[in-house]
Amino acid sequence: MNIPTVDLTDLSSNEPARVERGAAALREAFGVFGLVYVKNHGVDTQALQRFYDSFATFVARPLEAKRSSGRAEIWYQRGWTPPNTEVAVAGNGQPDFKECYFAAPYPTDEASALEFPNLYPENIWPPDAPPFFQEGLLTLGRSLHEAGLELLRGAALAMGLPHSVFADLCQRGPHVTRALQYLPLSGSQVNTGILWGEEHTDFNLLTLLPGGRFLNPQGQPAPGPDDKSGLYLRTRSTPEEPQGRLVRGSSPSGCIVAQVGQQLEILTGGTFLATPHVITAPGVPGWQRQSAAHFMHVHTSTVLFPLARFRTPEAVRNYAPPVLAGTYDIKTLVDIGLAPPSALDQLGYRHYDRLNRQRAGGSKV
């Protein structure tokens, strides 16, 4: 299986032939596989390893020492997410065996935060964060975001659209960078069907993955303990392979991975499909895995519906009705267990009790 690799310097080139080469790679990658390998991406891999070291130091702290950095009241959209919190929408209800840390790599948009405060909260940092924790996560997020913008411009050209269409939609969006550490299984848990993260698709526009690493039972970086554990991505179904194919998410040397999210699928009417992916656990106890992801979102005021170019009757049936991206985000965060069900009460008219209060107060109309 030949998943295309795109060179970001092709997409930013002044030479039309190079730009078209990059766009053609994205057309095939996102249209057939839902993901692409990216080289010359600008992510500092040495800094990434240094950040992973810092994050491992944080995760190793007792749970009580980390609780002040976890905020359920903002739906864990910033700061620490404790283990057994998030679930996959299309999974079997098993909470993920992981700890996470969320941060927005850019300053919060104040106007958007007034409308969707839980999607645009301020960053939270441990008061005694390990060295390079904050700087490392923010620098990683910004590097991945810049690479993502270039990919979105290339994806627009690949679809015959003005190059800025997708990039413009995500200006001031609720972008977030997440560090993850998948936790060790005990001897009684391995080979029992437990997954580090159940199969799911991301609900955002585009996800950038800089690559992860395993930690052995002594907490040291090491090659994976077997050939079955780690990130796997499911390709689009074909007549020959109706279930698609699970491919290992390890990219060629020096590359990162970008995968399509639900928002990009909706905007393209299914021309690009969101990438299902699963994180499998090793068959031996004591191992952990570290990874990171940057989630690019369209702005919360964007209407999620196929763009005019893709608005066929079939696409309308598949993706109607149109929905505000901020509403979509809230609904999904409830579905995956990060936001409480009561968050859905925000999505409709909230003043039905006004007449009752008037009646109780003796008002006459």
Describe each PLM feature range.
Residues M1-V365:
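Peripheral, non-catalytic segments flanking oxidoreductase cores
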